[in-house]
């Protein structure tokens, strides 16, 4: 900056020397011209000069090129007019012009409209015009107001020249007319030269501005830099010379006796704008240029460019960030919003760069000192009775005490980059610390990075004993709140250089140690920096008391011991949003009441970009924890129940989370992952960090809390080891107590009984080990060492088959075993007898199933995206969720502990979490509709036969994952209309099927069948009331049809003959032999058909192993001999065999179908072959024509 200033001064001096030389030459020429003009009695006409001067005023612009181009033309015209003007023809106009020019020059030299000058002018008209600039008083420097403008205008209107006065002046000036004309011409030339000088000065300013902009482009726009020296010089010189604005300069035009326009009063204070740092620097350089020009020439009025923004009356501007700034010359510049008395000092400690490697640094912290630069002591309080650093500060503490942050533990947080991210609050008036007056303290903030010493270090190391207060000093930094340029270093993130603390012992001085380092000791750079932010904080009106006060305004308030225990035992109080609403949630399912199958979609929850692998409700039912997967990681997402509100994410795992479980008191969450760790998370407000990490050598597939003691955690790993951990909730470590290596393969699942006396572990080879796990609360480690094996379960049925999931039955006597052979088993642990549940496909994925809390139903997911429901007591499949929007296998199912609610999840691209709930009102409305439409659709050609096709209501398609309110959105009339339309569509299909049957078939069954069919009707008939009572909900779309008697026969299922032997590889396949006649119920695809053989066996069989009877008759004799068909007697015997009472088709080929029980009248029994065959045919045709929709299907 100094170089640019010196160059400007040199150029200005050179220019003025040239101008003065030119001016002296012109004066010589003018003197010669005077003599010629006197001799020839010719007067110089100044009209041309006036017109040129007026033209320059009108065309004055910021473009110096225009001025430069006009200057030669003006000079030429001026010289020509001066030499050729004739004063004899312009005597009258010249006299008027002289008077007006005198008035104009006086007004120009006194822009404030001083009345005394006007009075002197009128009182002494014979004297010459005063050329010197009058001395301005302090009143002239005051800003201009509208009232002053009005007064000045009023004065100017009264001081216009009168005709009588002009006549007297002209008479007195007749004698020396020639001399006065020359003097006036000289004045005009001086005014013209003044304008030329101003234009050249503007051109110089423009060049300086351009250079300064290029040099200052790297400064940020929101930072203000001011030079104290330049501003002080500018203030001094502004008091001497008034600055005029270009826009406020009056314009004069002389023609005849009129003056166009009026002179305006101009403010003596220059406008100051805070738009940017560049404008401030450029304006200061322009002022310095003016000052240098004033040093070389006499002070004359000069024009400067007006700032783009107007100055407010209170001298306040708004910068680009919307911050009000005080622009008074006597006060420092900082945002006005920080001057509020309600604000207090807030220091936010962000972090440091990586500290220097030192094994002695394990938990650094930052100590903040508020020191006065004048005294070296802590800053005195503005109010001695106001607590600033601590709530219990006494009045005798009249200074601001230092405050420290919390320590950052490298070991616990697994990082050597300290990130405190902590807000430190000093309850001191913020404007008091920012005052720049001599009486106010000049505040410096000192930051010390410390590490506390252990007791052993202090005892063993004598050098450490010399350390003050048992702290090891690592580095320090400082920050001045008000810089040397008067700007406040606040409201932005600052990076402070750290320095080594001096090694020499401290001298006993009465100043703060950090201040002594700053003022007297050399500063050796520490290879790191500290990031801080200082700002004014508004203190909240109400601060809740706490066990330990964290700031000066927070009260410490303790609670009784029993209140603390009650608080620890309830996890509801620790959840956000639940403390405000203290009402108890009333669940729909009463204690001891049997569970219902949920029949209404409640809402869908977001599970991340890759879906959810496992989920679980908390024991109190208020939180749903879901182990999800996203692009950035594998978070555990917590949702509030029943609202479905998102609570928070627990991030830390680096790979898929296989298992998730809650502690018995719901204070902790345990997860196991394939990243080789099991993690414990605290269920607390705003706590998203890992509480404990249990490291393992490989993948961890399962982890559980011990039901009796939450400090014991059991994990199952890929290395076939079971590990027991003791987790101290109040200490920083987890201790590995014991390891078991009984299993020969990796462990997939663990579970405990309710009391925690037994544990069950299952591995990949189908082996289940029962453990005795009784513990004593007072001696955990000793109890764990006494854990033994109770027995090993090695069933031949699932030997070598991986066990996916284990769960104890609510009665504690049975065990749910989910294996990867598409079979679920519930085993009685006393006699080791298991009941099978077939239908849910599971051959590849790790899928979890679940039992309801009452043990009434068993829910299991499948790889085909269907959820199956069984009755564990009977083994019957009672329902299925057949059209869920999942494209991936359903991984986990969780049933709510207190509500008839279930949650499903799948692991795949954008798979949601679905929650279903039981709605009694929906079930009641559907029951009424079922009764109303029972048996009211007569069909032509078919006689009384009731075909009950029972389906659950169509569930709405959830395209988006928005939470639906649990309310009734449809009225009963609207539902009735929808059901009627649905029933009409179905009955049309049945009519077409019946017409086809009546047209093509005719057969008469023997009379003996009538008695059998009547018994079958009584056994298979299941009324709507029984269905509703058993399953707790009803179905829409119920079809009840009465058929009239006819002489036509109902078509039997087509039959095929087996050409080759086939042995079933799966439980849902059919074993056939050559020559077997198979009834085909439906063709699943071109490769697999579904049917039954004469022994009552049903299942899938390959289509390429069979042929129709017609094709079989055309086969060569050698093939017929190898696979002879059944004899007519055997065939008749098979046809007359009683149909089974229960019809159940379990399908896992990605389709769902419905079975109905059919009942016939006695007249119909004589004309139809078999109830079983007719039921399968009708069911198959109905399935082909059903409408797409999401259903829960009940199977009788």
Swiss-Prot record:
UniProtKB keywords: Cell junction, Cell projection, Ciliopathy, Cilium, Cilium biogenesis/degradation, Coiled coil, Cytoplasm, Cytoskeleton, Developmental protein, Differentiation, Disease variant, Joubert syndrome, Phosphoprotein, Repeat, SH3 domain, WD repeat
GO molecular function: identical protein binding
All copies of domain SH3, residue ranges: 1051-1111
Compositionally biased spans, kind Polar residues: 80-91, 102-113
Chief location: cytoplasm
CDD domains: SH3_AHI-1
Biased composition (Basic and acidic residues): 141-154, 166-179, 224-233, 1117-1136, 1161-1182
Keyword field contains Repeat: yes
Any one GO biological process: heart looping
GO cellular-component term (any): MKS complex
WD repeat spans: 607-649, 652-691, 695-735, 742-781, 797-837, 841-880, 885-926
Region of interest (Disordered), ranges: 56-186, 215-242, 254-327, 1115-1196
Expression across tissues: Highly expressed in the most primitive normal hematopoietic cells. Expressed in brain, particularly in neurons that give rise to the crossing axons of the corticospinal tract and superior cerebellar peduncles. Expressed in kidney (renal collecting duct cells) (at protein level).
PROSITE patterns, alphabetized: SH3, WD_REPEATS_2, WD_REPEATS_REGION
Region described as Interaction with HAP1: spans on this chain: 141-434
Pfam families per the UniProt record, alphabetical: SH3_1, WD40
Modified residues (Phosphoserine): 45, 1002, 1123
Localization per Swiss-Prot or TrEMBL: Cytoplasm, Cytoskeleton, Cilium basal body; Cell junction, Adherens junction; Cytoplasm, Cytoskeleton, Microtubule organizing center, Centrosome, Centriole
Induction behaviour: Down-regulated during early differentiation of normal hematopoietic cells. Up-regulated in leukemic cells at all stages of differentiation from patients with chronic myeloid leukemia.
Disease: Joubert syndrome 3: A disorder presenting with cerebellar ataxia, oculomotor apraxia, hypotonia, neonatal breathing abnormalities and psychomotor delay. Neuroradiologically, it is characterized by cerebellar vermian hypoplasia/aplasia, thickened and reoriented superior cerebellar peduncles, and an abnormally large interpeduncular fossa, giving the appearance of a molar tooth on transaxial slices (molar tooth sign). Additional variable features include retinal dystrophy and renal disease.
Protein's name in the database: Jouberin
Lineage: Eukaryota, Metazoa, Chordata, Craniata, Vertebrata
Gene name of the encoded protein: AHI1
């Amino acid at each position: 900056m100094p170089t640019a200033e010196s160059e400007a001064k040199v150029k200005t001096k050179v220019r003025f020397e040239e101008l003065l030389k030119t001016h002296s030459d012109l004066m010589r020429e003018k003197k010669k011209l005077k003599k010629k003009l006197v001799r020839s009695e010719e007067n110089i006409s100044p009209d041309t000069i006036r017109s040129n001067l007026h033209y320059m005023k009108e065309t004055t612009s910021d473009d110096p090129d225009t001025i430069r181009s006009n200057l030669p033309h003006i000079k030429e015209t001026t010289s020509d007019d001066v030499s050729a003007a004739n004063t004899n023809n312009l005597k009258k106009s010249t006299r008027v012009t002289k008077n007006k020019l005198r008035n104009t020059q006086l007004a120009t030299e006194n822009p404030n409209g001083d009345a005394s000058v006007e009075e002197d002018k009128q009182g002494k008209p014979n004297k010459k015009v005063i050329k010197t600039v009058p001395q301005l008083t302090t009143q002239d420097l005051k800003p201009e107001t509208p009232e002053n403008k009005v007064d000045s205008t009023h004065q100017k209107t009264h001081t216009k020249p009168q005709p009588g006065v002009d006549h007297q002046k002209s008479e007195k000036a007749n004698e020396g007319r020639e001399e006065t004309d020359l003097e006036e011409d000289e004045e005009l030339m001086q005014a013209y030269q003044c304008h030329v000088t101003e234009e050249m000065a503007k051109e110089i300013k423009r060049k300086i501005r351009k250079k300064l902009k290029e040099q200052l482009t790297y400064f940020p726009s929101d930072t203000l830099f001011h030079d104290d020296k330049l501003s002080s010089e500018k203030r001094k010189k502004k008091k001497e010379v008034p600055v005029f604005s270009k826009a406020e300069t009056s314009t004069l035009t002389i023609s005849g006796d009129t003056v166009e326009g009026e002179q305006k009063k101009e403010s003596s204070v220059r406008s100051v704008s805070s738009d940017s740092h560049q404008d401030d620097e450029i304006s200061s350089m322009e002022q310095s240029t003016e000052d240098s020009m004033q040093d070389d020439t006499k002070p004359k009025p000069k024009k400067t460019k007006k700032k783009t923004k107007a100055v407010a009356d209170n001298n306040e501007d708004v910068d680009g960030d919307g911050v009000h700034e005080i622009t008074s010359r006597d006060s420092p510049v900082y945002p006005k919003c920080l001057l509020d008395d309600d604000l207090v000092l807030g220091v936010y400690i962000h972090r440091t760069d990586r500290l220097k490697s030192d094994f002695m640094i394990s938990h650094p912290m930052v100590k903040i000192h508020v020191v006065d630069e004048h005294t070296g002591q802590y800053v005195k309080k503005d109010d001695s009775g106001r607590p600033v650093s601590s709530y219990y500060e006494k009045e005798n503490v009249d200074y601001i005490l230092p405050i420290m942050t919390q320590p950052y533990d490298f070991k616990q947080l697994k990082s050597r980059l300290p990130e405190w991210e902590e807000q430190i609050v000093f309850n001191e008036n913020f404007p008091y610390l920012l005052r720049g007056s001599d009486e106010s303290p000049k505040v410096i903030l000192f930051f010390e990075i410390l590490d506390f010493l252990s007791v052993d270090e202090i005892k063993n190391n004598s050098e450490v004993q010399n350390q003050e207060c048992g702290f090891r000093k690592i580095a320090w930094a400082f920050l001045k709140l008000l810089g040397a340029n008067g700007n406040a270093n606040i409201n932005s993130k600052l990076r402070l250089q750290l320095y080594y603390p001096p090694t020499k012992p401290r001298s006993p001085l009465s100043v703060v140690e950090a201040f002594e380092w700053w003022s007297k000791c050399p500063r050796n750079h520490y290879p790191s920096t500290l990031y801080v932010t200082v700002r004014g904080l508004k203190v909240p009106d109400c601060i809740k008391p706490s066990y330990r006060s964290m700031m000066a305004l927070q009260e410490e308030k303790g609670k009784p011991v029993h209140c603390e225990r009650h608080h620890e035992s309830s996890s509801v109080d620790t959840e956000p949003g639940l403390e405000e609403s203290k009402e108890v949630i009333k669940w729909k399912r009463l204690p001891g009441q049997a569970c219902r199958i949920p029949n209404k979609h409640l809402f869908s929850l977001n599970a991340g970009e890759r879906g959810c692998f496992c989920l679980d409700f908390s024991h109190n039912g208020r939180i749903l924890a879901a182990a999800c997967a996203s692009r950035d990681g594998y978070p555990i997402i917590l949702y509030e129940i029943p609202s479905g509100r998102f609570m928070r994410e627990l991030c830390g795992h680096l790979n898929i989370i296989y298992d998730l479980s809650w502690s018995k008191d719901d204070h902790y969450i345990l997860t196991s992952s394939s990243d080789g760790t099991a993690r414990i998370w605290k269920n607390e407000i705003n706590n998203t960090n890992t509480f404990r990490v249990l490291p393992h050598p490989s993948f961890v597939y399962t982890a559980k809390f011990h039901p009796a003691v939450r400090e014991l955690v059991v994990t199952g790993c890929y290395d076939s080891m079971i590990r027991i951990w003791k987790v101290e909730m109040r200490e920083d470590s987890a201790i590995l107590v014991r390891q078991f290596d009984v299993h020969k393969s990796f462990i997939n699942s663990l579970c405990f009984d309710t009391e925690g006396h037994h544990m069950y572990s299952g591995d990949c080879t189908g082996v289940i080990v029962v453990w005795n796990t009784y513990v004593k609360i007072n001696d955990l480690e000793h109890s764990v060492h006494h854990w033994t094996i109770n027995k090993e379960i090695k069933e031949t049925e699932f030997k070598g088959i991986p066990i996916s999931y284990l769960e104890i039955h609510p009665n504690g006597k049975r065990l749910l075993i989910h294996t990867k052979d598409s079979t679920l088993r519930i085993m009685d642990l006393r006699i080791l007898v298991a009941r099978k549940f077939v239908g849910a496909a599971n051959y590849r994925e790790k899928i979890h199933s679940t039992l309801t809390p009452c043990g009434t139903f068993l829910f299991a997911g499948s790889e085909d995206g269907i959820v199956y429901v069984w009755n564990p007591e009977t083994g019957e499949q009672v329902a299925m969720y057949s059209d869920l929007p999942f494209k991936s296998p359903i991984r986990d199912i969780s049933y709510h502990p207190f509500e008839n609610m279930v949650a499903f999840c799948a692991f795949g691209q954008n798979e949601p979490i679905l929650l279903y709930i039981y709605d009694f009102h929906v079930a009641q409305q559907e029951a009424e509709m079922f009764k109303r439409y029972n048996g009211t659709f007569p069909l032509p050609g078919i006689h009384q036969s009731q075909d009950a096709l029972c389906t659950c209501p169509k569930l709405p398609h959830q395209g988006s994952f928005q939470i639906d309110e649990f309310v009734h959105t449809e009225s009963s009339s609207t539902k009735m209309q929808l059901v009627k339309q649905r029933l009409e569509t179905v009955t049309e299909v049945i009519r077409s099927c019946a017409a086809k049957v009546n047209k093509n078939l005719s057969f008469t069954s023997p009379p003996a069948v009538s008695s059998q069919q009547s018994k079958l009707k009584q056994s298979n008939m299941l009324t709507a009331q029984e269905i509703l009572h058993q399953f707790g909900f009803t179905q829409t779309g119920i079809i009840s049809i009465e058929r009239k008697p006819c002489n036509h026969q109902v078509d039997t299922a087509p039959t095929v003959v087996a050409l080759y032997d086939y042995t079933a590889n799966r439980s849902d396949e059919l074993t056939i032999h050559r020559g077997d006649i198979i009834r085909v119920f439906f063709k699943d695809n071109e490769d697999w058909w579904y049917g039954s053989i004469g022994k009552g066996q049903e299942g899938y069989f390959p289509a390429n192993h069979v042929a129709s009877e017609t094709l079989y008759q055309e086969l060569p004799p050698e093939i017929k001999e190898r696979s002879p068909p059944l004899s007519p007697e055997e065939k008749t015997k098979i046809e007359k065999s009683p149909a089974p009472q229960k019809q159940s088709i379990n399908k896992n080929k990605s389709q769902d179908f419905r079975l109905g029980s059919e009942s016939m009248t006695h007249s119909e029994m004589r004309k139809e072959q078999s109830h079983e065959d007719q039921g399968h045919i009708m069911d198959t045709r109905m399935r082909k024509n059903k409408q797409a929709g999401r259903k829960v299907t009940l199977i009788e």
